[in-house]
């Protein structure tokens, strides 16, 4: 079965970070006293370690780079409590995750707070997000029920994948990975760094191809990422992110029986 997902999966997100204080002073009327008030406004949906009262784990970018290797992205969560992830043997990008026994249809998976579960059955097609591991800055996994502003069925838990912003440090990297069954991955990334006017940009391109251990599981995938940042001062930061991961892969949906193996081979 040949699954072609060259329909580009694209996330474009704007992030505004604003911190400010507002000074309100009531005008004096008659004998009333002046009232001074400070109003602080902020929104944060990221759990803080040892402060937010939920069972949550945070996987940093350094951990992903060190331990992922040629595994599929969900498999990095196997060291997380109450999480089970597997390739499932079907093909490239056909992984699945269980949290506390609940399958993906009962887990809310989000990228920068945007749900990516299928709108019909709630499933997650990781083959559409094969390049997300290259652009992830951190990932939080909340186990069990939690408060959410979105109408999502997340009785098993919630995953929020945060992508990189434009890197403030200038530099680049080129990587090449090789594995069994013709697996190879090449990646190029470059960061301009933040200039004197507050502008910064990051760019990444990657290609992954090869096959799994089973016959007929060839695949090829690409990943592109661009981020543009503007920080005019210390309290304002504007980030624009654009990423996508077109790919195709052959899928092994069912294993042959012993009788079929004897008659037709593998």
Please state what every model-predicted region is.
Residues 36-37, 136-141, 157, 163-178, ...:
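Transmembrane beta-strand segments of Gram-negative outer membrane beta-barrel proteins
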Residues 75, 98, 140, 160, ...:
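Outer-membrane beta-barrel architecture
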Residues 115-143, 162-163:
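Short acidic/polar hinge/loop motifs at secondary-structure boundaries
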Residues 74-115, 137:
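Extracytoplasmic beta-strand/coil segments of soluble accessory domains associated
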Residues 1-30:
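Cleavable N-terminal targeting peptides that direct proteins into the secretory/outer-membrane pathway or into
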Residues 31-33, 52, 82-93, 151-155, ...:
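Short, glycine-/polar-rich solvent-exposed loops and beta-turns at beta-strand/coil boundaries
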Residues 171, 178-209, 214-252:
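Transmembrane beta-barrel wall of Gram-negative outer-membrane proteins
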Residues 36-67, 96:
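N-terminal periplasmic "start-of-domain" segments of outer-membrane beta-barrel proteins
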């Amino acid at each position: 079965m040949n699954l072609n997902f060259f329909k580009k999966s694209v996330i474009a997100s704007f992030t505004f970070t604003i911190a400010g204080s507002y000074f309100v002073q009531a005008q004096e009327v008659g004998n009333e006293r002046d009232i001074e008030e400070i109003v602080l406004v902020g929104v944060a949906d990221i759990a803080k370690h040892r402060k937010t009262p939920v069972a949550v784990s945070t996987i940093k970018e350094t951990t992903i780079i060190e331990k992922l290797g040629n595994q599929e992205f969900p498999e990095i969560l196997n060291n997380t409590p109450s999480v089970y992830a597997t390739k499932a043997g079907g093909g490239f990008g056909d992984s699945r995750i269980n949290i506390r026994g609940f399958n993906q249809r009962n887990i809310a998976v989000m990228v920068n707070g945007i749900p990516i579960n299928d709108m019909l059955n709630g499933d997650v097609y990781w083959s559409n997000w094969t390049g997300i591991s290259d652009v992830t800055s951190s990932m939080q996994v909340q186990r069990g029920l939690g408060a959410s502003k979105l109408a999502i069925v997340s009785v098993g838990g919630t995953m929020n994948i945060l992508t990189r912003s434009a890197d403030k440090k200038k530099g680049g990297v080129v990587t090449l990975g090789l594995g069994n069954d013709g697996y190879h991955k090449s990646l190029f990334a470059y960061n301009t760094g933040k200039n004197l006017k507050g502008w910064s940009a990051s760019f990444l391109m990657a290609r992954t191809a090869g096959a799994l251990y089973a016959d007929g599981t060839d695949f090829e995938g690409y990943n592109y990422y661009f981020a543009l940042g503007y920080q005019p001062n210390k309290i304002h930061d504007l980030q624009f992110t654009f990423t996508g991961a077109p790919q195709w892969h052959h899928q092994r949906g069912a294993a042959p029986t012993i009788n079929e193996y004897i008659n037709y081979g593998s």
